[in-house]
From Swiss-Prot:
Region described as Flexible loop: spans on this chain: 109-119
Compartments, record wording: Cytoplasm
Protein name: S-adenosylmethionine synthase
Pfam name, any one: S-AdoMet_synt_C
Gene Ontology terms: biological process: one-carbon metabolic process; S-adenosylmethionine biosynthetic process
Amino acid sequence: MMRASYLFTSESVSEGHPDKVCDRISDEIVDLFYREGPKAGIDPWQIRAACETLATTNKVVIAGETRGPSSVTNEHIEHVVREAIKDIGYEQEGFHWKTCDIEILLHPQSADIAQGVDALQPGEVKEEGAGDQGIMFGYACNETPDLMPAPIFYAHKILRMIAEARHSGVEKVLGPDSKSQVTVRYENGKPVGVREIVVSHQHLIPDMTSAQVRERVEPYVREALPKDWITKDTIWHINPTGKFYIGGPDGDTGLTGRKIIVDTYGGAAPHGGGAFSGKDPTKVDRSAAYAARYLAKNIVAAGLADRCTLQLAYAIGVARPLSIYIDTHGTGKVSEDKLEKAAAEVMNLTPRGIRSHLDLNRPIYARTAAYGHFGRTPDNEGGFSWEKTDLAEAFKRAV
């Protein structure tokens, strides 16, 4: 049985965190292939990308496997990378969008992998299989309007609000690199307040003190959190090391796929281990995790549970999921068996079915690279389609 009263902590990192810079670059390259493919007459279903990025002092290295239009040259990729770094805001001596060295090591996808992933020609019976084996989890709960756990939801919100102020020019002395951490107090299983707040934020004036940084960031923290959650007993940790002038890849080397808990549920739910960024949606690490969130969110949105964890499992080259598992943590209005059966009925959970249902063969991935892949608002370009609750009624009928 779940404890009634406890503390739970989640962290977030900003778009300027070194690992997130790499996630953004990797996803920009995925988007580039999806933008340029149709222009070259290539079917979006045939696009493939698995792109890893390393960023360090004045150096970016990109490696991986791709399949797409020959019009995507290294010069094209380099331009996209520099624009991404510029948009994040890096114009520092140790990492500048104009002058950093960019090395590109992309090559075609393995034929051995392709033969198990690609569908055959029209009229043949084999359906495309999963791009790899693995387990993926989705989760939803009714703690926030977006059906996300409160700690990660508010950790993201704090940094997103500060980033918006920085981009608008209001906070010119703050740099791109930052981290947040929120310890939420639960009573009777519900979030009711914040015990501890951590914000470490890069500053562009070398001798800024922690107190001066707090003057800048505290208003955004207070605006991000529910009004009565911060009290006189709330403990603040703002730039607790005292100085955060050297930031981004100049301060710490970044890699794609290193912030998988930040990307998902902040530790409030299991994680299958696979990262998202840099991967086209034939990689079920990404697409099936999106589908699992979509199904879990719709179960909660339908009022069939207050909390829902959903697991999917796949084998490389095999289309159907090997298993579907649902746990409603004692909050379900119907049995988990019925929900598992309903999940298989309301959505085609083959890799192709997921890509089709969620319309994933499009350039929608760079926007997911920071502030979480879940708990976001679906946009007009098709981004965050897995956050829709349009299956809620179908679930109600199916159970």
